[in-house]
UniProtKB/Swiss-Prot annotation:
Active site: 249 (proton donor), 277
SUPFAM superfamilies: Pectin lyase-like
Pfam families in the cross-refs: Glyco_hydro_28
Species of origin: Pectobacterium parmentieri
Cellular location(s): Secreted
Annotated function: Involved in maceration and soft-rotting of plant tissue.
Protein name per its UniProtKB record: Endo-polygalacturonase
Ribosomal protein in keyword set: no
Keyword Membrane part of the UniProt annotation: no
Enzyme class: hydrolase
Entry keywords, A to Z: Cell wall biogenesis/degradation, Disulfide bond, Glycosidase, Hydrolase, Secreted, Signal
GO molecular function list: polygalacturonase activity
Protein family membership: Belongs to the glycosyl hydrolase 28 family.
Length: 402
């Protein structure tokens, strides 16, 4: 053991023993099983025209409990502007069929000239697919939804991703559309569908109760900024299972905001993560409870299992369990960081009952456990955590139990 720059740095390897049932650790209060694809109310055939009004009309006229089916016609691509899912109605995309967002910023603006620009706000675009106050709606594959994030916009000289990169340089915010935005909804399902090239976050489930992503594939280049995979925000009863997620930002980011509902009862089970920023909680952590991450494989993420926040957004995080996790080519396998960004604020993180069990990193990495408050250290339990012998641990204001 040695000390560097006021921090304790450890190099150690702890043996792994045994596995345990994922079902015993599931946190979603619902009984969740593999979804069943609903029957269709109508079938639309793709052609060369822009299909926004045709798809929206079919969705509006569809009976609850059924889906609008998108099938190949003279082409396999439906080109569309923003769509809204009604309550109880789903979208079904056939194998080999792609629902593709138009590459025109004006189509997504929610105020005159608000989308496709950089400013201090970053809220000028509608999502490609929106569901508000729905119950039992969903999106089903095995087809694909393509946000065209890397394609130059017809009414701009840049792509959505180039706009995001420009905003970073200018220290501003990009106005780019999310792929799927679900607000104040119950029991929303993503099943067996592929999501690619989102201009911004791929899926956001906000202020809702009941969300399932099962056999969902998300694939966007690692260089595409702010392209989170799935973000549950101020919501409860979430299951993400048997899915593959590779993005340019957090693969999954669980968030809880001030003045809104707590985020609780989250199950992340049997998933594979490729490139991205990892399995994250935060940076908004104002009430996150009862999270289970079990049977997760990660290869090539910058971070592995991460809880992040700062003085502006920290709060209570309690009851987080990571188990049966295998990582490879992950620079920082475990990160618990209360000073993720140097923002102003008076919030004190209260993080406790965080358990890592049967967690392996097969390649060299750095574990960062960084507490902000010596009087209220973070409580972490580690059992059977295995790192390579040349990995290092950085610990400050954190109580580690074995």
């Amino acid at each position: 053991m040695e000390y560097q720059s006021g921090k304790r740095v450890l190099s150690l390897s702890l043996g792994l023993i045994g596995l345990f049932s994922a079902s015993a650790w599931a946190s979603d209060s619902r009984t969740v099983s593999e979804p069943k694809t609903p029957s269709s109310c109508t079938t639309l055939k793709a052609d060369s025209s822009t299909a926004t009004s045709t798809i929206q009309k079919a969705l509006n006229n569809c009976d609850q409990g059924k889906a609008v089916r998108l099938s190949a016609g003279s082409t396999s691509v439906f080109l569309s502007g923003p769509l809204s899912l009604p309550s109880g109605v789903s979208l079904l995309i056939d194998k080999g069929v792609t629902l593709r967002a138009v590459n025109n910023a004006k189509s997504f603006e929610n105020a005159p000239s608000s989308c496709g620009v950089v400013d201090k706000n970053g809220k000028g675009c509608d999502a490609f697919i929106t569901a508000v106050s729905t119950t039992n709606s969903g999106i089903y594959g095995p087809g694909t939804i393509d946000g065209q994030g890397g394609v130059k916009l017809q009414d701009k000289k840049v792509s959505w991703w180039e706009l995001a990169a420009d905003a970073k340089v200018k220290k501003l915010k990009q106005n780019t559309p999310r792929l799927i935005q679900i607000n104040k909804s119950k029991n929303f399902t993503l099943y067996n569908v592929s999501l690619i090239n989102s201009p911004n976050f791929h899926v956001v489930f906000s202020d809702g109760d009941g969300f399932t992503a099962w056999k969902t594939t998300i694939k966007t280049p690692s260089t595409a900024r702010n392209t989170d995979g799935i973000d549950p925000m101020s919501s409860k009863n979430i299951t993400i299972a048997y899915s593959n997620i590779a993005t340019g930002d957090d693969n999954v980011a669980i968030k809880a905001y001030k003045g809104r509902a707590e985020t609780r009862n989250i199950s992340i089970l049997h998933n594979d993560f490729g490139t991205g920023h990892g399995m994250s909680i935060g940076s908004e952590t104002m009430g996150v409870y009862n999270v289970t991450v079990d049977d997760l494989k990660m290869n090539g993420t910058t971070n592995g299992l991460r809880i992040k926040s700062d003085k502006s957004a920290a709060g209570v995080v309690n009851g987080v369990r990571y188990s049966n996790v295998v990582m490879k080519n992950v620079a920082k396998p475990i990160v618990i960081d209360t000073v993720y960004e140097k923002k102003e604020g008076s919030n004190v993180p209260d993080w406790s009952d965080i358990t890592f069990k049967d967690v392996t990193s097969e390649t060299k990495g750095v574990v960062v456990l960084n507490g902000e408050n010596a009087k209220k250290p973070i409580e972490v339990t580690m059992k059977n955590v295995k790192l390579t012998s040349d990995s290092t641990w950085q610990i400050k204001n954190v109580n580690v139990k074995k």
